[in-house]
From Swiss-Prot:
The gene is LPE1. Belongs to the nucleobase:cation symporter-2 (NCS2) (TC 2.A.40) family. It comes from Zea mays. One of its GO terms (cellular component) is membrane. One of its GO terms (molecular function) is transmembrane transporter activity. This is Nucleobase-ascorbate transporter LPE1. Inhibited by excess of xanthin, uric acid and ascorbic acid, and by 100 um N,N-dicyclohexylcarbodiimide and 30 um carbonyl cyanide m-chlorophenyl-hydrazone. The keyword Oxidoreductase does not apply. The keyword Membrane applies. Keywords: Membrane, Transmembrane, Transmembrane helix. High affinity uric acid-xanthine transporter in A.nidulans. Binds, but cannot transport ascorbic acid. Disruption phenotype: Disrupted chloroplast ultrastructure. It is found in: Membrane.
């Protein structure tokens, strides 16, 4: 055995900017790469859009036509909101799409007893939609106030790398129930998709020099095309003709209901279902989801900043981004998207898979969202891709997003018992508490908090059902209180590495990555 060289024992250097990218936030790739990677970002967020509509619309009494319009509306607003965030928000290459966090309060509003007397399904759909719109508008106002008034800036100023690790990690890991459990709904389609994606993205791209572009840049697209054709062959061969309705829904590639229900051309517009209905308890329920979504978006944006090659966001930039996210949710409520907008976790993972963190790519993906929403018939064809294929993609993409949280450990002293305590307790309870809330509701039909106030029940159950939110609260409080007075704590928690980014003017790279376009920074300066 050869002796170990001294240089091999040197500790890995700390990297404030992720070095494993081919194109960073300010370096756009060639146009062919830009278009192909941008289309993949659209394809990835499409799965979330279809899943949200599939869960909520039938509960409201809507059919295929209503579901198609909702999908079209979510896509259109996602494109608009992504452009707003990339141009005027954080300016990070983050896709803004529908958030899973809003599903819980949305379902609670839909199942409210006051709608039980509505017999006609379409009438029930319209009334519940209008109630959701009112609640979303209030939730958006809350986020806009928190962002634009600088309240979130105060939170970020005291955030250390140690406190950020748990909730950035659980922003990805906390969505595990949308990943492999979705694959198992049609294992003969989902599992091959998962295996192919891993082979193409992580093995073939390094082994085959001639096909490196296809595998490194288009692994998701190639995987989806191959498995979609495979699913079409299984469907045409009658493999699911004798299976149950649940299996057929998950596996069949000819879900023509969405295609038939979609118009050829349609432009979503504000209040297309009528004027919003503002109900006190509905608004409070949605406010809790807005708070949880705010934390999850922050975790996702930290992951995006890593995978785009940018430095850590200054607090004022984070606050600006959250403010624009609030504006996005208000637009969602006006047009009727069922759920609010948040930074897409899966698209953050796609930045790592493609190694392309360019801002221009995300702008192109937003244009794809808008195009396929306006020409809804074409978008409906892609929306008919079996959901287990998307679930297979999420197994890799959510994991990569979680990996961005692990990368922050480079700033921390892992030989400190304080560090181990904060990391372990926040990660463990961040997974354990939400799992308890989910299992409890699965068995009893309601959450552990079950008082006479429905709004209070939903608020508490929503917050403690979010792994990232639970982890963020625990890690932040523990990091800011436990042994805070000891001299070594600042170094152990990685505070000195991020101290230069706590003000916009302390590091020149902040101006390079986060300044507003069109000279707007002169009129809206960052602090």
């Amino acid at each position: 055995m050869p002796p170990v060289k001294a240089e091999d024992l040197v500790v890995h250097a700390v990297k404030e900017q992720f070095a494993g990218l081919d194109y960073c936030i300010t370096s756009p790739p060639p146009w062919i790469t830009t278009v192909l990677v941008g289309f993949q970002h659209y394809l990835v967020m499409l799965g979330t859009t279809v899943l949200i509509a599939t869960i909520i619309v039938p509960l409201m009494g809507g059919g295929h036509a209503e579901k198609a319009i909702v999908i079209q509306t979510i896509l259109f607003l996602s494109g608009i909101n992504t452009l707003l965030q990339v141009h005027f928000g954080t300016r990070l290459p983050a896709v803004m799409s529908g958030s899973y966090t809003y599903i819980y309060p949305a379902v609670a509003i839909i199942l409210s007893p006051r709608y039980a007397l509505l017999i006609d399904p379409l009438e029930r759909f319209v009334f519940t939609m209008r109630s959701l719109q009112g609640a979303l508008i209030i939730a958006g106002v809350f986020q806009a106030v928190v962002g634009f008034f600088g309240i979130w800036r105060v939170f970020i100023r005291f955030l250390s790398p140690l406190a950020a690790v748990p909730f950035v990690t659980l922003t990805g890991l906390g969505l595990f129930f949308f990943a492999f459990p979705g694959v198992t709904k049609c294992i003969e389609v989902g599992l091959p998709a998962l295996v192919l994606l891993v082979i193409f993205a992580e093995y073939a791209s390094h082994l085959f020099a001639k096909g490196s572009f296809v595998f490194s840049r288009c692994a998701v697209l190639v995987t989806v095309v191959i498995i979609w054709i495979y699913a079409e062959i299984l469907t045409a061969a009658g493999a699911y003709n004798e299976r149950g309705p649940v299996t057929q829904f998950s596996c069949r590639a000819d879900r023509s209901g969405i295609i038939q229900g979609s118009p050829w051309v349609r432009f979503p517009y504000p209040f297309q279902w009528g004027y919003p209905i503002f109900c006190f308890q509905d608004c409070f329920a949605m406010l809790a989801a807005s708070f949880a979504s705010l934390i999850e978006s922050t975790g996702t944006l930290i992951a995006v900043s890593r995978y785009s090659g940018a430095t850590f966001c200054p607090p004022s930039v984070f606050s600006r981004g959250i403010g624009w996210e609030g504006i996005s949710i208000i637009l969602d409520g006006m047009c009727g998207t069922l759920t609010g907008t948040a930074a897409s976790v899966e698209n953050a993972g796609l930045l790592a898979v493609t190694r392309v963190g360019s801002r221009r790519v995300i702008k192109i993906s937003a244009l794809f969202m808008i195009f396929f929403s306006l020409f809804a018939k074409f978008g409906a064809v892609l929306a008919s891709i079996p959901l287990p294929i998307f679930a297979a993609l999420y197994c890799v993409l959510f994991a990569y997003s979680a990996g961005a949280g692990f990368s922050l450990l480079q700033y921390c002293n892992l030989n400190s018992l304080r560090t181990k305590f904060i990391l372990s307790i926040s990660l463990f309870l961040g997974l354990s508490i939400p799992q308890y809330f989910r299992v409890y509701e699965m068995f009893f039909g309601f959450g552990p908090v079950h008082t006479h106030s429905v709004a209070f029940n939903v608020m508490v159950n929503v917050i403690f059902s979010s792994p990232a939110t639970v982890a963020a609260i625990l890690a932040y409080l523990l990091d800011c209180t436990h042994l805070y007075w000891e001299a070594s704590v600042k170094k152990d928690r990685g505070w000195f590495w991020w101290e230069k980014f706590k003000s916009y003017k302390y590091d020149g790279r902040s101006e390079e990555f986060y300044r507003l376009p069109y000279g707007l920074s002169r009129y809206f300066p960052s602090l």
